[in-house]
């Protein structure tokens, strides 16, 4: 067995970790759709899905079977290649972004020294999926939804990136593992509270979640940029949205709440519990807040979020310089 070298073993272990972690993320995203419906029913004083299986436990399986057997229809005058490519990009962009998240010591798919920049790149790639879907569908509502989504996402990605620069300045690194280790004594949410608030708001907007779901507003745009999608293509958009929620929640935990760190319990359990809490907060926000107008969303971003991130960055830089003296 001389062909089994240490380098080959390391590659196989990395591939195994990647497969396990990414499968867990996809599974969490799928189950979150069921959990969201149950929790929304609880918040709104009604029953959620409770007919398929015991207490609705097989509802997700029924939805998957239905999605597989739906007609995979493509509009007559659409661009077939781009129309097919868009949901694949939407599904994989934020899924690949999870590769830089350390779920416990030693368990990270890609321990990159430019981890935060890689995440911002993947978040920017998701904009192309929206633009491709809106333009290739040959539908006016789809195109309007894509224009809204791209403008909103590009705007809030500015605040998303700026809100992370304070964390990078404090940790002295773009590496996610280094950022977690730098929070051994104090979580970043305390010195970077305004950065966390801005990151959370921008994260909801980048995921196109309520109340920032104007690109998909049913009352205005008839479901927005994926109105022409059906079957598994729509399923990729649908699951991709929940994968984005899982990724953003995991990044909140990693960047601001100490990652896997915590007493008594194993590191992975701490990471999972913290991430599940923020996933539930996404659902609570959807159940609690109304949808504002599109101009109000953009105005809020540029007039409130941008100054807040700049002030946070300036204060962080001043504190670091003061401590260095």
From Swiss-Prot:
Entry's localization field: Cell inner membrane
Superkingdom field: Bacteria
Signal peptide: none
Protein name (Swiss-Prot/TrEMBL): NADH-quinone oxidoreductase subunit H
Annotated family: Belongs to the complex I subunit 1 family.
Record's function text: NDH-1 shuttles electrons from NADH, via FMN and iron-sulfur (Fe-S) centers, to quinones in the respiratory chain. The immediate electron acceptor for the enzyme in this species is believed to be ubiquinone. Couples the redox reaction to proton translocation (for every two electrons transferred, four hydrogen ions are translocated across the cytoplasmic membrane), and thus conserves the redox energy in a proton gradient. This subunit may bind ubiquinone.
Main location as per UniProt: membrane
Translocase listed as a keyword: yes
Membrane topology: Multi-pass membrane protein
GO biological process: aerobic respiration
GO molecular function, one term: quinone binding
PANTHER family tied to this protein: NADH DEHYDROGENASE SUBUNIT 1 (PTHR11432), NADH-UBIQUINONE OXIDOREDUCTASE CHAIN 1 (PTHR11432:SF3)
GO cellular component, one term: plasma membrane
Classification via HAMAP family: NDH1_NuoH
A Pfam family matched in the record: NADHdh
UniProtKB keywords: Cell inner membrane, Cell membrane, Membrane, NAD, Quinone, Translocase, Transmembrane, Transmembrane helix, Ubiquinone
Enzyme class, UniProt record, top EC level: translocase
Oligomeric form and interacting partners: NDH-1 is composed of 13 different subunits. Subunits NuoA, H, J, K, L, M, N constitute the membrane sector of the complex.
Enzyme Commission code: 7.1.1.-
Enzymatic reactions: a quinone + NADH + 5 H(+)(in) = a quinol + NAD(+) + 4 H(+)(out)
Transmembrane residue ranges: 11-31, 81-101, 114-134, 154-174, 186-206, 237-257, 265-285, 304-324
InterPro entries found in the cross-reference section: NADH_UbQ_OxRdtase_su1/FPO (IPR001694), NADH_UbQ_OxRdtase_su1_CS (IPR018086)
């Amino acid at each position: 067995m001389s062909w089994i070298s240490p380098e080959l073993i390391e590659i196989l272990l990395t591939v195994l970790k990647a497969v396990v972690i990414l499968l867990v993320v996809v599974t969490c995203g799928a189950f979150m759709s069921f959990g969201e419906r149950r929790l929304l029913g609880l918040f709104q004083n009604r029953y959620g899905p409770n007919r398929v299986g015991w207490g609705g436990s097989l509802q997700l399986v029924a939805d998957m079977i239905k999605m597989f057997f739906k007609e995979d229809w493509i509009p007559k005058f659409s661009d077939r290649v781009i129309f097919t490519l868009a949901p694949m990009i939407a599904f994989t962009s934020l899924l690949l972004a999870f590769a830089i998240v350390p779920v416990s010591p030693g368990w990270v798919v890609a321990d990159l020294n430019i981890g935060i920049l890689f995440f911002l790149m993947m978040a920017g790639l998701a904009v192309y999926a929206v633009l491709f879907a809106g333009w290739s569908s040959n539908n006016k509502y789809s195109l309007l939804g894509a224009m809204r989504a791209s403008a909103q996402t590009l705007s809030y990605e500015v605040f998303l990136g700026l809100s992370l620069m304070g964390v990078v300045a404090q940790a002295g690194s773009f590496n996610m593992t280094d950022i977690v280790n730098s929070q051994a004594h104090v979580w970043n949410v305390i010195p970077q509270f305004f950065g966390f608030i801005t990151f959370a708001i921008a994260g909801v907007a980048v995921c196109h979640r309520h109340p920032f779901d104007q690109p998909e507003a049913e009352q205005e745009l008839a479901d927005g940029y994926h109105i022409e999608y059906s079957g598994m293509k729509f399923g990729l958009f649908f699951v991709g949205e929940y994968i984005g929620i899982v990724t953003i929640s995991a990044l909140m935990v990693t960047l601001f709440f100490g990652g896997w760190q915590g007493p008594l319990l194993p590191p992975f359990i701490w990471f999972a519990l913290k991430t599940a809490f923020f996933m539930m907060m996404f659902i609570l926000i959807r159940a609690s807040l109304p949808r504002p107008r599109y101009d109000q969303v953009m105005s809020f971003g540029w007039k409130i979020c941008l100054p807040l991130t700049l002030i946070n960055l300036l204060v962080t830089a001043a504190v670091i310089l003061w401590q260095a003296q």
